[in-house]
């Protein structure tokens, strides 16, 4: 390369250094100073990764003094270029030596990089275009936020998330029965709200014992990194901000923390967008004396726009408290309890009409009269005639039924505020089969119990019952903690034999404490060499993940997983169908939680529940109360908490030392009360609410679309190529999984989410659902989103030169492929992307300026191209400059015309959708007070704002590919 002192060059490998100046040429070496950073670089003259910077007539160059020159011509003297043209400030003719060019010039625009010889690899141009297409595809999907989470595609869950997640500041009560996935529904809504920009700051309030469960659930299922706040964290965060809640965007805390006035005041001042409250049935309220917990949530609900309340038992504390929770969501709508009761009584007529529409039979006269009265402001006669007709297409009849049903749902009931699915309305649950195994009480335990009784001591009734239910713990208190109770406990002998006879089955074992779980693992390992792993609260999240993964492995994995009560919270193992309850919890909700580890939607087999117990002990009496009184082993018991509250004292007395008559009396009373509560719940089922909550055919359609998206092989190929380009090392691990690690040749110094020790991922949803340690990769996953951002946010692939070997075209024929981006700057919360997302516009020009993009598709054209090295590419660009400059101007004309059309379509779509929704809600507001004025006002403001943003839409050249025909 010919070098001369003072010449300006740029580094091909370190473009961030800016414009360099040759300061020394000696022998075979050249030294370049980069004044913008003050750094020197020494290169071999023959192989220097440098590109000479020479501007052309028509370009604008900037001097180091800040003024610009419009270049008209250039001259060269002693190897240095002098630019001549018009001074930007004086308007007069001026000259500028290249040595006086601005050092900070960077070639960010594709045209500048192309003419400066900064030409990228051919495959990088392709991956950049694919990245822009993927971003556009994601932004335009009406299912945005539903595909990425690692959850099963359950229709009713996806329906609720789809309906609620799209709203501005949703305020709803999620009240599905146990096991139907309220946490997943809430997570899906949170994920949607964050991904679409409707929310940025989220506060989740949960019982103290569930903080960790929610933290794990949000991270593992939704890739959302929440922070758990307690008093210590608040004190620690005070160093960074006066209000600790401002130090994080996504926060989980307990209700106990917010009972403190100081912390509540700080939370009230923290500008949350969305508030989520789990176990909301604990919020007790009466008009005269609302509980402190209720007052805390009420204060927050008054200042936070979006509120999600979660409860499996909305009537647990009475119907008045249920009304109070609805009042938290919309105090204007639910202002009077008596009015609420009167309105509820009218729901029965609506439910009868809804059930008639939801079926297939012809409508009765009573149903028609009821519908006509309920929808009096609408002429429904044509729809009724269609439904009643004999020889009409069934699809048309079904459409008419669906339309009338939707009208009912819109106009009556609490459908927009309350969602509740029951096991009666959602199919797909397995049977629960209970097996009990009696064993004689060991003499060692009897001795420990006698010693304990002689020693006396003050203990509560509940503490005595807990001791009676876990004799091994009492035994260890007297013998010492290392006592090997498992060497004589007959339940352990039974467990070993059971596992040996079920070697091909995965078995989940749950015990009350971590010590018991660890002892059981030791017993299985030392006595029979049975592969088992433990899972308890003393382990870190990573350790629990590894244990769960070891249990989930089909080949070489653990046969049994032994969990403690707390350690198993939030984890589901529905790939197993055998559950061993080594002991029983005192609380019916905890029993249901244990069984719920396996009894979930998605469980493929009947669940076998095994309970080894000690005869004539508290264990047998509690078993009988659960089984005969509540039928809690074989069916879910929504009234379990109420029954325990009512019978707790009698139950504890029976457990500690009651006789058979007391037990029989307790069982009779419990059975009677259980039937009463069950009947009341059945009578209270709101059929209209259930129809609205599970979504019917619409929910199934959403799931089908998501399932099709999961099978998109094009997406998988694009993501794999993206990682290849970036330099991510990919190791096939088998079982549909890949291990990703940063390689030594990463294109970017950091890749957030990609750790040094690797990340295991899969594109298969079923694999991800069965393995907590494997991430599910979709286009919504942070690893994909980050990869797209790294490519599109850098200059990777913005310039490329290729050869087209085609003898049907004259050699030297030139094509210019231009990728423009149509975009409009707007806050993410405006949701402009729904109408005008960042859209790639492809223009393919021949040398005469004709756009061939409609005739020559990208994929077929790309397959015919061959790469050229950078130096040859740079020479070809230089030789083609006279042709290229006018083509760029022509390309922009075509692209601008396309943008104008896109903006017009976006405006029409926006106006049509929002006006239609506004008209619908305004008409509904007259008959359904559930429609909030805030929603209407939001839609009006959104239309005005979006119109302004569309007016400011922009066009930007994103990437260039110059193609020359060759016959060689």
UniProtKB/Swiss-Prot annotation:
Q: What is its EC number?
A: 3.6.4.-
Sorted alphabetically, the Gene Ontology BP terms of this entry are:
regulation of DNA-templated transcription
Q: Which UniProt keywords apply?
A: Activator, ATP-binding, DNA-binding, Helicase, Hydrolase, Nucleotide-binding, Transcription, Transcription regulation
Signal sequence: where?
A: none
Q: Tell me one GO molecular function of this protein.
A: ATP binding
Is RNA-binding included in the keywords of this UniProt record? no
Q: Offer one Pfam family short name for this entry.
A: RapA_C
Highest taxon listed in the record's lineage: Bacteria
* Residue ranges annotated as motif DEAH box: 278-281
Residues that hold ATP according to the record: 176-183
- The EC category is hydrolase
Per its UniProt record, what InterPro entries does this chain match?
A: Helicase_ATP-bd, Helicase_C-like, Helicase_RapA, P-loop_NTPase, RapA_C, SNF2-like_sf, SNF2/RAD54-like_C, SNF2_N
Report whether DNA-binding shows up as a keyword of the record. yes
Task: Report domain Helicase C-terminal positions.
Answer: 491-655
Domain Helicase ATP-binding intervals:
163-332
Check the record and name the PANTHER family matching this protein.
DNA ANNEALING HELICASE AND ENDONUCLEASE ZRANB3 FAMILY MEMBER, SWI_SNF-RELATED MATRIX-ASSOCIATED ACTIN-DEPENDENT REGULATOR OF CHROMATIN SUBFAMILY A-LIKE PROTEIN 1
Q: How does it assemble?
A: Interacts with the RNAP. Has a higher affinity for the core RNAP than for the holoenzyme. Its ATPase activity is stimulated by binding to RNAP.
Function, as annotated: Transcription regulator that activates transcription by stimulating RNA polymerase (RNAP) recycling in case of stress conditions such as supercoiled DNA or high salt concentrations. Probably acts by releasing the RNAP, when it is trapped or immobilized on tightly supercoiled DNA. Does not activate transcription on linear DNA. Probably not involved in DNA repair.
NCBIfam families annotated for this entry? PRK04914.1
- The identity of this protein, by name, is RNA polymerase-associated protein RapA
Species per Swiss-Prot/TrEMBL record: Shewanella sp. (strain MR-7)
